Design a protein with these regions (language model features):
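Membrane-interface "cap" regions at the ends of multi-pass membrane proteins
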Residues: 1-16, 49-104, 286, 325-326, ...
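Membrane-interface helix-loop-helix modules in multi-pass membrane proteins
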Residues: 24-30, 35, 82-144, 155-159, ...
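Extracellular loop-to-transmembrane helix junctions
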Residues: 32-52, 56, 110-140, 195-205, ...
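Flexible loop linkers connecting adjacent transmembrane helices
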Residues: 56-83, 109, 123, 132-161, ...
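Helix-loop-helix module between adjacent transmembrane segments
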Residues: 92-98, 125-145, 149-223, 230-262, ...
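Loop-to-transmembrane helix boundary motifs in multi-pass membrane proteins
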Residues: 156-174, 366-378, 463-465, 483-493, ...
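Hydrophobic alpha-helical segments and their helix-loop junctions in multi-pass secondary transporters
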Residues: 190, 209, 213, 229-260, ...
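Extracellular/periplasmic helix-exit of transmembrane alpha-helices
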Residues: 300-316, 371-472, 507, 551-557
Length: 717
């Protein structure tokens, strides 16, 4: 071992020691004031060391990436779907596609157990499972002409598991879209400022699309500056309009109204050409995403806030007010996207590999973008932990959990205002008393004052994680840049999240439409035609109708839809990740690299253990704390039967909603179990079949060398 080689590793070893020291401080300090800075430094050190060593090991030993091999983008370069793209541009594109609302919401919900469990899982999960899955799927797909996950399972394991996987992917897509839409609805309900600002993004995106296509083609920088100026203006004018005596009440909508508006919007936008609304919004969202997260990290370094949430709360036993379930397995399902996410397998196959200019970029894009997403999740966890824990619980606990009834805020205006304000005052007093009795002291005045600071009528009943994160962002940005008030920064946070989510909703509805056309095309060939308007309208209507139904059920759920849909989303998302890792294992076995399969088998087994355990509990547990699907449905059926004439029509309707939701969730859960375990069965069957065959049996496309003179990359796509 020569000295030069050894010296190269010294800075990395020091970085590792620094990360370990910071993590130890985060983990072991109790009762003292812990700065949020420890978490930020620990995370960055872990990411850098993991990227330098573990991802390099996977690239060189497990995959043996080959820089001389031409990628699908180079071989099939058609200027449309296959375009060799600059690696930094593609990193931004890929990151924008994978970082939906998951890394923003899951960690905020997980903070009810304290900041420590979430931090540890986000770091360990991404290094050993999440980034490995993204990297692996991107590599396998780029060696199969950019095939989608379902197609690759079909090629490597057979037609039956391929069709099952397609079906499973589509179902998971529907749940993801319903959950994403639910978060937007919860953030915009009863919020005129939010409604105005988020609705403004549609004409802004359309204007940018037309500007880039016809007025000034190719001027990406110029149009992005105009877009950002218009966005900031929309936040400012949103505040003016919200306080207007006429427009304020006129733009205050009920959650069901926003639900139907969103369903209509998604249907139309999925049928429009990509350049008109999707691409420009993608640019805006990517600038905003990376800008806000980097800004938040710098803000935390400048103001060095203290973590107010305890490291571990009493709720690790599973009795938390936001969601029920003990630390194992439920924490690993609540934090879906920052640590590991199956949804990424749908982006890393089919979309990104068709744009990759060189095979060696897969490490930077596959492993690197997932580390970036984990950092987003860490920032969300920190933002939720630096606000008062009492405020955190008051905002996120459903009204029923606080023992309060929320007044109808959309009826504000005129003579009703004083009455509703009095009701809000009473609700805040109740909420403060309840939360304080749990050991997180807060006064009714603090709850009312926070609402006033952020320019909203109330902060109660703001579940879904988005408003909490926006309050955290507002706290940091307001201290660093005090010229703008808290209301501006809060709505800036809401806009940031809504843009994140609407981009994912647009792209997801498009992808879901193609999946449905693919699935139904097996039975009715005409529906497979992606260029046919009729088939497109039918596919889009089917996709939007399915997630719209789940969304509506979640919105009218009296127990708060996030509570019922989020566990299902987390479980299905992690199961899809397990399916992707099973495919990775099968491909490694067929490539005769069996000695490395621990890289994919270990995370796959862990995910299967967590998801199966959680689903078993959610389906069959009779513990009232856990709110199991069948248990809840039966309980409410009995209540309806026993209540008889004493129940009002509204109460019966509410109870029926709960029964329907629980049966829907149970049905979907059983379907997921069947999908995942049948794919594992076929995976093992394939392994047995190829075990004794000499030589490789995988379906990789033949080797084509990189053209002489290198590859020209595009910097905009």
């Amino acid at each position: 071992m020569d000295i030069k080689k050894l010296l190269k590793h010294v800075p990395w070893a020091l970085l590792g020691i620094l990360g370990a020291f910071c993590l130890a401080v985060v983990a072991l300090r109790r009762g003292e004031h812990v700065s949020a800075l420890w978490i930020v430094v620990a995370s960055v050190s872990v990411y850098l060391v993991a990227y330098r060593y573990y991802s390099l090991y996977i690239a060189q030993k497990v995959m043996k990436l080959d820089p001389t091999r031409a990628t699908p983008a180079v071989i099939n370069n058609d200027g449309l779907n296959y375009v060799p793209t600059n690696r930094y541009v593609l990193f931004g594109h890929h990151f924008a596609a994978i970082a939906g609302a998951g890394p923003l919401v899951g960690p905020v919900l997980a903070a009810q157990m304290g900041y420590l469990p979430g931090t540890l899982w986000l770091l360990a999960g991404v290094v050993l499972a999440g980034a490995v899955q993204d990297f692996m799927v991107l590599f396998i797909s780029s060696r199969r002409n950019g095939s989608s996950l379902g197609e690759m399972i079909k090629e490597e394991m057979g037609r039956v598991p391929g069709t099952i996987a397609l079906f499973g992917c589509f179902l998971i897509m529907i749940i993801i879209l319903a959950v994403l839409a639910l978060i937007v609805v919860k953030a915009l309900a009863e919020s005129p400022w939010g409604v105005f600002t988020v609705c403004s993004t549609v004409p802004i995106a359309l204007f940018m699309g037309i500007y880039m296509r016809f007025l000034r083609p190719g001027r990406v920088g110029e149009v992005s500056v105009i877009g950002i100026v218009l966005l900031v203006a929309s936040i400012y004018f949103g505040g003016v309009i919200a306080h207007d005596p006429y427009w304020g009440p006129a733009l205050t909508f009920k959650d069901t109204t926003i639900t139907f508006a969103l369903i209509g919007y998604a249907f139309v936008s999925a049928l429009l050409p990509v350049w008109l609304i999707l691409a420009p919004r993608d640019y805006l969202a990517t600038f905003l995403k990376i800008g806000v997260i980097v800004g938040l990290a710098i803000g935390i370094v400048i103001i060095n806030p203290e973590l107010k949430m305890p490291a571990v709360t009493q709720y690790i036993d599973g009795t938390g007010p936001l969601w029920k379930g003990a630390l194992f397995p439920f924490l690993f399902i609540t934090i879906a996207c920052g640590a590991v996410s199956g949804f990424h397998a749908l982006i890393s196959s089919g979309t990104t590999p068709k744009l990759m200019a060189n095979e060696t970029d897969a490490r930077f894009i596959g492993y690197g973008a997932m580390l970036m997403e984990s950092f987003v999740a860490i920032m969300a966890l920190v933002a939720a932990s630096i606000i008062e824990p009492g405020l955190y619980f008051a905002m996120n606990t459903p009204p029923a959990g606080l023992g309060i009834t929320m007044p109808n805020l959309h009826e504000m205006g005129g003579e009703n205002t004083a009455l509703i304000m009095a009701q809000l005052k009473e609700a805040s007093a109740h909420a403060a008393a309840t939360v304080s009795s749990w050991g997180f002291v807060i006064s009714p005045e603090q709850i009312m004052q926070t609402a006033k600071d952020i320019g909203e009528p109330s902060v109660l009943n703001r579940a879904g994680g988005a408003p909490t994160l926006a309050v955290g962002i507002a706290h940091v940005f307001h201290k660093v840049l005090p010229w703008a008030d808290m209301g501006f920064w809060y709505h800036f946070g809401i806009l940031f999240e809504a843009l994140f989510i609407l981009t994912a909703l647009d792209a997801g509805t498009r992808a879901g439409r193609f999946m449905l056309q693919d699935l139904l095309g097996n039975f009715v060939p005409f529906l497979k035609k992606t260029d046919s308007l009729v088939a497109g309208v039918l596919g889009t209507a089917g996709c939007v109708g399915l997630w719209g139904y789940l969304l509506y059920q979640g919105v009218v759920d009296p127990l708060g839809g996030v509570k019922s849909l989020w566990p299902l989303f987390g479980i299905s998302n992690q199961m899809l990740a397990a399916v992707a890792l099973v495919l990775g294992t099968v491909v490694l076995v067929k490539m005769k690299r069996t000695k490395y399969i621990w890289v994919t088998v270990v995370p796959a087994l862990w995910l299967l253990l967590c998801t199966t355990w959680a689903l078993g509990l959610k389906l069959f547990s009779t513990n009232p704390q856990l709110e199991g699907f069948f248990f809840m449905a039966n309980q409410y059926k009995e209540k309806i039967a026993a209540g008889g004439a004493d129940l009002t029509a509204q109460q019966i309707a509410n109870m029926n909603h709960i029964v329907v939701n629980n049966y829907t969730n149970a049905g979907l859960s059983i379907l997921f179990l069947v999908v995942v375990y049948s794919i594992i069965f076929y995976g093992i069957k394939t392994w047995m079949k190829v075990r004794n065959i000499d030589g490789r049996t995988d379906k990789e496309t033949p080797y084509v060398p990189v053209p002489e003179g290198g590859v020209k990359t595009s910097s905009h796509h």
